[in-house]
């Protein structure tokens, strides 16, 4: 939908200082790769991003512009494909990002998309560009301090995320749950009731609102995302768990996959990512 998209020209990106992060030695995009040629002919790289994750990707409600680490990264990728290629951002959630790749509506997704063995069976992931860990945010008054204190509680998670499974696995690893009924390949937060229950939401602000209203007693997702919803009346439990590596996602077998992976490796090596992470306070 056009209302969820924003065109950001590379000229504007350069004015914002994005070009200073790019390597002066630019890899030439192979025009004989059909997916890359299609982007060059179109003049637009279609990218799925979050619109509410501070530091990674946020959409300004007035200007419609996207800013953040992943938005800058998308612009750098577009610049490598072609000097005149623009970025068309589409807001996605954990529940919608993969289907928009499958349908061909997006060329790639940069949306705090965690790399897992299961997901790699269905989509291509680049080398990780950021690592985080899952944590749990609670209200101070809840007296929830540890994983074990979540027994009997309802936890808010994002639909389509891996947070619920990671939490249950951590509780099993810490011998809080016996895990007899846990199957990682078939895990479904909607039907899991052993020790802890889950309520799935379409977006993070909805989980935060539910936590404030005590509709859920905990908010579980990656720590960098939870930091956005941390207030003086909220605390993190003591444990962090399940390291989460984020990668650029493309359709399985896409000719774009190897090209993007090469760029990620180059920028990891030349210090580009270190600068971007500092710039976005991550």
Task: Please tell me what each predicted stretch does.
Residues 38, 138-155, 178-179, 258:
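Flexible hinge/capping segments at coil-to-helix
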Residues 75, 79, 86-149, 233-240:
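Acidic, polar ligand-binding/catalytic clefts
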Residues 51, 130-141, 191, 223-265, ...:
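Periplasmic-binding protein-like
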Residues 28-42, 162-195, 227, 231-240, ...:
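Ligand-binding clefts/hinges and TM-proximal coupling segments of bilobed small-molecule sensing domains
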Residues 96, 113-122, 165-169, 173-174, ...:
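A ligand-binding cleft/hinge motif common to bilobed small-molecule-binding domains
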């Amino acid at each position: 939908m056009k209302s969820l998209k924003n065109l950001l020209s590379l000229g504007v990106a350069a004015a914002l200082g994005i070009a200073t992060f790019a390597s002066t030695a630019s890899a030439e995009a192979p025009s004989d790769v059909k997916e890359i040629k299609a982007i060059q002919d179109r003049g637009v790289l279609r990218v799925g991003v979050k619109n509410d994750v501070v530091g990674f990707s946020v959409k300004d409600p007035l200007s419609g512009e996207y800013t953040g680490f992943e938005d800058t990264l998308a612009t750098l990728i577009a610049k490598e494909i072609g000097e005149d290629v623009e970025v068309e951002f589409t807001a996605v959630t954990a529940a919608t990002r993969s289907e928009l790749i499958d349908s061909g509506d997006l060329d790639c997704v940069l949306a705090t998309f965690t790399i897992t063995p299961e997901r790699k069976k269905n989509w291509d992931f680049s080398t990780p560009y950021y690592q985080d860990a899952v944590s749990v945010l609670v209200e101070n008054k809840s007296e929830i301090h540890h994983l074990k204190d979540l027994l009997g509680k309802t936890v808010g998670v994002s639909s389509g995320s891996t947070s619920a499974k990671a939490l249950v696995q951590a509780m099993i690893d810490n011998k809080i749950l016996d895990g007899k009924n846990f199957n990682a390949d078939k895990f479904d937060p909607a039907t899991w009731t052993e020790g802890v229950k889950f309520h799935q939401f379409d977006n993070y602000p909805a989980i935060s609102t539910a936590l404030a209203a005590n509709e859920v007693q905990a908010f579980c997702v990656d720590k960098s995302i939870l930091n956005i919803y941390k207030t003086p009346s909220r605390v993190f439990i003591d444990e962090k768990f399940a390291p989460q590596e984020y990668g650029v996602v493309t359709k399985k077998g896409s000719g774009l996959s190897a090209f993007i992976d090469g760029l990620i490796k180059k920028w990891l090596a030349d210090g580009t990512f270190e600068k971007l992470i500092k710039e976005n306070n991550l």
